[in-house]
Amino acid sequence: IKSSAASDVYKRQTWDRVEYVEGQNEYIPIRTEMKAFIDSYFKQANELAAQGDTTILSLVHSIFGENPYELKEIINRWMLGKNDQLKELLKKTGKDIQLPLIPTDSIVMKVDKEAVRRSGMKIPEALGDSIPEYMTITLRDANGNPKRALYKSELMMLEMLANANWERPIYMAITVGSENHLGMGNHFMQEGLAYRFTPFDTDKLDSKIDSEKMYDNLMNKFKFGGIDKPGIYIDENVMRMCYTHRRIFTQLVGQLIKEGQKDKALAALDYAEKMIPSYNIPYDWANGAFQMAESYYQLGQNEKANKIIDELANKSLEYMIWYLSLNDNQLAIAGENFVYNASLLDAEVRLMEKYKSEELAKHYSTQLDQLYNEYVTRMKGK
């Protein structure tokens, strides 16, 4: 993997890209979705694609360029064309075709079944060898409502899908917000730090993770860069990435347990503990530690599970004690945070009880009751 950025901002706008080099593939350009709103990105994406196949982005720059009426231009070129019926509809409902509507909220794409088979993507077990004839993309926002406009990045995504024809994989980083998924999250299959676009409805088919590829990526291909070295300082940005990596390990482990691959699940858990150690990256609900503990319990590794859940419970307990050290007025303001940590500790105690860690459960349940009763007593009348 190598990355490059233009240094002369006076000659051209800053350009970021990653080029993936493997075997005979030469350079395969990877598009930056967050930059897809920038006009120059489309032009540079084709100019600077090295030796990669650029036909995946065939839209001419004039459609996207500096023209302030890009959307109108796109509609005139793409949607109006020879479609007289649509043209009349827009004339009746719009003013000078300013587009108060999108004529459809669904796009249907014919699926090349042989290309899908050649692609190497996981075909959900529920389908057997049956691949759907068509892929339906419903244009909806993050709240499930029909979209009223398509932006440049979304048009780019749609065209990439249309032109790639499953001959090459198309991915989206797992850190991209759902508001930028163009309603296609039900076609994603996770292979690591990225979702792969598929022609399948992975939600309905219960096939959201390709455990084989994800296991290989996490266990054999990921490079962690020394975050396991004791005593190093990890800043906020790196810590967030560490949280993400621990979470995806728990997702993989959960899928492996579901598939009955317990040996691989245990190996993945132990590897995560080794490469993302708690002495540098403390256990936290936000980084999947609770799920790690539960997975260890499910695999019969109670000692390892107790270590994690004990640290989580102690953290929740310390927060509750600290909030109770405030005066009554301050505690009233912070009451929601106190209750939140109490709910975490309650969940942790219930997990201990579920897997028969009775001594540990009793230790924390007693303190939970005492602290919560103190909180209720102090907040009466507040």
Roles of regions detected by a PLM:
Residues A5-K382:
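ER/secretory pathway lumenal C-terminal domains and tails of membrane proteins involved
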